[in-house]
């Protein structure tokens, strides 16, 4: 019995430590993007950073012009998550199709919130 209590305390401590390791969201998003933000932090943030900026992480930031829609489509993001690549392991067993869709919506919202402009947007603004 004494050892059982010790095991329970040890396992509880480990579980608390593990749950506190994942990066936490640092920005408040509208309700329609909360599910995507939550899934992003569960599956993606350990590599791509809590704010998807990639700072001090092993993976690139996703809030970057390279990942805007005209450079990297939603379908390409989906395929990258499911299939992986030489730089990124597949996340197929960690996230469902509908959760990937929510993550993509959250990323697109975050790109817009970061005021990333497409080349077309920059040209249109300079014409005014």
What label would you give each PLM region?
Residues 1-9:
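Bacterial N-terminal signal peptides that target proteins for export
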Residues 9-15:
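Hydrophobic helical h-region of N-terminal Sec-dependent signal peptides
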Residues 17-20:
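C-terminal motif of bacterial Sec signal peptides marking the signal peptidase cleavage site
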Residues 22, 47-53, 108:
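Detector for the c-type heme attachment site
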Residues 26-30, 41, 89-128:
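Flexible coil segments in periplasmic/lumen-exposed cytochrome c-class electron-transfer proteins
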Residues 31-33, 37, 53-79:
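Gly/Gly-Pro-rich "capping" loops immediately C-terminal to redox-active cysteine motifs
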Residues 38-49, 60-61, 78-79, 86-90, ...:
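C-type cytochrome heme c attachment motif
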Residues 51, 66, 85, 110-114:
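A general structural signal marking secondary-structure boundaries and capping sites
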């Amino acid at each position: 019995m004494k050892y059982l209590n010790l095991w329970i305390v040890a396992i509880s401590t480990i579980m608390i430590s593990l749950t506190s390791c994942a990066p936490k969201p640092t920005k408040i998003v509208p309700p329609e993007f909360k599910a995507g933000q939550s899934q992003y932090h569960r599956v993606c943030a350990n590599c791509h950073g809590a704010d998807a900026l990639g700072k001090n992480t092993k993976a690139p930031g996703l809030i970057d012009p390279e990942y805007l829609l005209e450079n990297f489509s939603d379908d390409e993001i989906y395929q990258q998550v499911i299939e992986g690549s030489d730089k990124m392991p597949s996340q197929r067993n960690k996230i469902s199709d509908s959760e990937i869709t929510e993550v993509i919506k959250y990323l697109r919202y975050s790109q817009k919130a970061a005021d990333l402009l497409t080349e077309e947007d920059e040209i249109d603004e300079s014409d005014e």
